[in-house]
Design a protein with these regions (language model features):
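Mature catalytic core of soluble alpha/beta enzymes
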Residues: 1-305
Length: 305
């Protein structure tokens, strides 16, 4: 979904930009830069790959490795939707962890250097957000001042909508212990300046075994599904790539560690929906996030006149 106000229709330019993007960062396209890197082909990486790689490395360092684009082999081991849950052994995890870790891969000039040829990169937890930013840049280059770019639930926005109001996006209300997500809106996020909003939620994809919920987000440190208490994490940041990556990071860390990390990163605000020890749904959010929550902001003013 891309909404914008412009003198001419930009559909063709947007489509060709997305095709170029896929040729850089889509691991399922065998001709893409990332696929060639994963296949250990001799390839010079492009500017988009470089920007994503550098941002991923920065967030990996800040989060102590909770965010890690090298954990693709672990995701593959568990199988999509944990189809291989019962067959995964600690030995298998340890053997794969030998070639997982953001410190084991680096960018030198335009070349990716791997410590182990088995290292695979997967940027899915940052690339959708970056795609929003890429299209936003294109729109700005074309003189567009008001737009909203939404790709796979991640959003970059600037200016106002058709009615002249600030852009608004909804955060879905998760259902604990059911098939996942309702269409009910838990919260409205309103952005009146340029920025990115991303939500990561494991209620969409989890597996229950022996009474424990295993979330689809893998913890790179342990090699196991994160199993944290966060149902969904929404991040507001200056750009959507940053928001997207931190939303995933929060899912890995859990509520307390996520809040601690956020204190050291003033550029991001968060809204977390989590399950407490009794399985009750609760919310927590950063002080600065209140600015983007019109419904709660009004309540806060009424409660604290």
């Amino acid at each position: 979904h891309i909404k914008y106000k412009a003198k001419q229709i930009l559909t063709d330019k947007i489509d060709s930009e997305l095709q170029r993007f896929n040729l850089s960062l889509n691991p399922f396209n065998p001709n893409s830069t990332i696929a060639k890197v994963n296949n250990n082909e001799d390839v010079e990486v492009d500017e988009w790959f470089t920007e994503v790689f550098n941002k991923a490395e920065e967030i990996s360092q800040k989060s102590g490795g909770a965010f890690d684009i090298t954990c693709a082999p672990l995701i593959n081991l568990w199988g999509f939707g944990f189809s291989k849950m019962d067959s995964v052994t600690p030995q298998m995890i340890d053997s794969i962890k030998a070639f997982v870790g953001y410190q084991k891969v680096r960018l030198e000039g335009k070349k990716i250097i791997k410590e182990d040829p088995r290292i695979l990169l997967n940027c899915s937890s940052i690339a959708k957000g970056y795609a929003c930013d890429v299209i936003a840049r294109l729109l700005e280059k074309e003189g567009v001042k008001n737009y909203m770019v939404e790709i796979g639930g991640e959003v970059t926005m600037k200016g106002v909508n058709q009615q002249g109001d600030c852009w608004r996006v909804g955060i879905n209300k998760p259902e604990i212990g059911t098939s996942g997500v309702t269409n009910d809106v838990e919260e409205i996020v309103q952005l009146c300046q340029k920025g990115g909003v991303a939500t990561s939620g494991d209620y969409r994809n989890f597996y229950i075994k022996d009474g424990k919920k295993y979330a689809h987000t893998i913890n790179p440190a342990t090699g196991y599904p994160a199993g944290q208490n966060i149902l969904s994490a929404t991040i507001v940041a200056e750009d959507c790539m940053t928001a997207d990556a931190y939303a995933t990071t929060f899912m890995v860390l859990g509520v307390e560690k996520a809040k601690l990390l956020a204190q050291s990163i003033p550029q991001i605000e968060y809204f977390i929906i989590y399950a407490d020890n009794n399985g009750q749904q609760k919310v927590t959010y950063s002080k600065g996030m209140l600015e983007y929550l019109p419904n709660r902001k009004t309540l806060a003013i009424l409660e604290n006149p």
